[in-house]
Amino acid sequence: MESPWNELTLAFSRTSMFPFFDIAHYLVSVMALKHQPGAAALAWKNPLSSWFTAMLHCFGGGILSCVLLAEPPLRFLANNTNILLASSIWYIAFFCPCDLISQAYSFLPVQLLAAGMKEVTRTWKIVGGVTHANSYYKNGWIVMIAVGWARGAGGSIITNFEQLVKGCWKPEAEEWLKMSYPAKVTLLGSVIFTFQQTKYLAISKHNLMFLFTVFLVATKITMMITKTALVPFACFEDTLSRMLFGWQQQFSPCEKKSETKSSFNGTGSSTSKPVANASDKVKKKHSKKTE
């Protein structure tokens, strides 16, 4: 007989994301789009462009993972139910009378519930991406990590293409150059689930899914309540960067000291030259007098 813990984690891993968790994911993605400057005005002027941008926010991870695996990028359009659901949320979020959806979403408990449910879908996307990549490239670590990362956090990455098309792309906002917390934690999850998939991490998948989801939800809710950009592994990042890439900074003070010593020796030799020249002149004068 299985333990209650295993029964709980196994039942959790079998939870369907449709429709409630998918609705939360679409709602958070669309509301993040609406809060961007000029997004509401663009929806009134050009609804088709706004709808396309919303679909990129909702399905960007799946599109990017398809591109990496050389699959049709528009395969997400084949799921009519999810497209209609995401389109309905986009419509009521931008065109609801009296802006009722935005007013309801402004309450903190609603935001916490939606954000927590969205983090649950992130775990499912990472696991799905890693498993799907493993079916193409057996035990291909790099491919599995890349596809799991793309499916879990590809929405924020692929929207850079949308900003480039609209002409409002900014290099300093590039996700590859300055990774956000969701991108970092998704990369971490992709690495962990890749190790589990390749049997290098001795833990069952359903237990790992439960523990990682609890970590994601707890961290996200804490960040929203405290309104701080809390990064749980910032100390680990700093220590690892110093160990692997901080050697040049450690040796730079030694180089500066050697440079100062050489410059001091150079000035000393330059000052000794006039003294030597003066002594030579004195010797010449003395020899002339004796003559």
UniProtKB/Swiss-Prot annotation:
It is found in: Endoplasmic reticulum membrane. Residues 1-15, 70-80, 123-138, 197-207 are lumenal. Its main location: endoplasmic reticulum. It is a multi-pass membrane protein. One of its GO terms (cellular component) is endoplasmic reticulum membrane. It holds the Pfam family TRIC. The modification Phosphoserine is found at residue 262. Residues 257-291 are annotated as: Disordered. Residues 261-274 have a biased composition (Polar residues). A 1,2-diacyl-sn-glycero-3-phospho-(1D-myo-inositol-4,5-bisphosphate) binds at residues 118, 122. Keywords: Endoplasmic reticulum, Ion channel, Ion transport, Membrane, Phosphoprotein, Potassium, Potassium channel, Potassium transport, Transmembrane, Transmembrane helix, Transport. Residues 282-291 have a biased composition (Basic residues). One of its GO terms (molecular function) is identical protein binding. Residues 34-47, 101-103, 157-179, 226-291 are cytoplasmic. GO terms for biological process: bone development; bone mineralization; cellular response to caffeine; endoplasmic reticulum organization; establishment of localization in cell; extracellular matrix constituent secretion; lung alveolus development; lung epithelial cell differentiation. Homotrimer; conformation seems to be controled by binding to diacylglycerol (DAG). Intracellular monovalent cation channel required for maintenance of rapid intracellular calcium release. Acts as a potassium counter-ion channel that functions in synchronization with calcium release from intracellular stores. Activated by increased cytosolic Ca(2+) levels. This is Trimeric intracellular cation channel type B. It comes from Bos taurus (Bovine). The lineage of its organism: Eukaryota, Metazoa, Chordata, Craniata, Vertebrata.
